[in-house]
Amino acid sequence: MLEAGAIEPRRVKLPGILVDGIVEHREQPQTYLGGYDLTISGQHRRLSSNDAIELVSHPVRRLIARRAARELVAGASTNFGFGIPGGIPGVALREGVPYQSLWLSVEQGVHNGMMLDDALFGCARNADAIIPSLDQFEFYSGGGIDIT
């Protein structure tokens, strides 16, 4: 526990009136799939290959992702919404789209990296930035995306 006033007021994220107690749960899983991956939390980077992102298994989703991958533009700030768009990064990696020249983001606040899909949608390995989703929507509403 910290003494009252031990944190600079601008760094406080949750006012004390809303806190009854603090519990540390050391076994809390990071994702639905359990365990803890330092490359998802941004604490570690590791080399990854073009098969680092799994392809969507459903053929119709893969077809849609392939078509959408053709619309990606190098240097454009691109938002991937939830659902079908989650399959686009995996297809783009394998189909010769210059993945490293793209600026990718999702509403959860992740920028770039190896975007994950399915139960891990909203996560990325080796992200360049992970910001609060409220800040992400400010970025979007302020004109920060070129393609969505």
Regions found by a protein language model. Name each.
Residues 1-49, 113-148:
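Conserved phosphate- and dinucleotide-binding cores of soluble alpha/beta proteins
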